[in-house]
């Protein structure tokens, strides 16, 4: 008899609802909207709604294809192949052609929700199916999701400890006393590590940057010290070990100049924007931001400031010093978003640190940890 997978969801999940035309942006613009094969087959038999540009109300399917160059023969003609997948062909403004001016979907208005592709039906929902359970989360690309994270700390159900939620107050001192909900031995340690990282990122006595660094260093050490046991994981996340790690990180940070960190962030921003700019995506947002970033790079080169110098020594004396003053002002203002950013990062860890495809081929424990180390780096880069 087949056992149904247990569904695991954060506490905010069921509170989500699409705000449709009230959305300040739209999820129907400037990204690859995939169309699955089943939907594409159905779309070949459905002609565009009357509200589509160039599609006259009185036209039949045959008339549409013959008389109007702007109206597609069927819904499938509004798709194309890109990077090996079928996607909706966006218009010149990188918007979905089915998106109306009121930010509502012409297809839904004409045919109902069942006409949509799997991507449009599920977004911003994300589902990860593991061998013994299923994890549902929401992606941060939706403003309605961000609103759910703004004012309240979110919690995540435990897949390792029975009847437990993971918040900043959760600590576990004897893992062996709890029932493991994950059946496969090689997967248990990965989920246990994830739960400790979630708790660490929820600890408001530790800065976000410190929590990210500590999580990354612990993952690296665990990767180097195979095999992993529950006792070893507990030791690495114990208050004593964390305090030693924080002391070491503080000492290391004192040897790194403020400029080195700032300059690296500025260069990273420009690197991350390359592919988007190449495809002409998010131009209204990225163009002024990257122009400013390039200007800052020129300031440092023009002022002759090099990595290793103390930015405080230049305070207010030149362009670079004035920039540094503005940077500190920004950091102070940015601090007000810390609760939201903690929720964002903890959701990223829950949804992206462990991916189902990394467990499908019965991998070695070392492979699991290697994937987790790489995923942790991507999560930190996003922050």
Q: Could you tell me what each predicted segment is?
A:
Residues 55-75, 176-181, 305-318:
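Intrinsically disordered, low-complexity terminal tails and inter-domain linkers enriched
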Residues 35-39, 138, 189, 193, ...:
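Alpha-helical structural motif
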Residues 205-383:
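Hydrophobic, aromatic-lined core segments that form the binding pocket/scaffold
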Residues 31, 108-112, 130, 181-185, ...:
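Conserved aromatic-histidine-acidic binding/catalytic patches
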Residues 1-102, 108-117, 121-166:
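N-terminal cysteine/histidine-rich coordination modules
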Residues 62-97, 105, 117, 187-194, ...:
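Extended, compositionally biased low-complexity polar/Lys-Gly-rich tracts
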Residues 20, 24, 190, 194, ...:
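Short runs of predominantly hydrophobic/aromatic residues within well-ordered alpha helices
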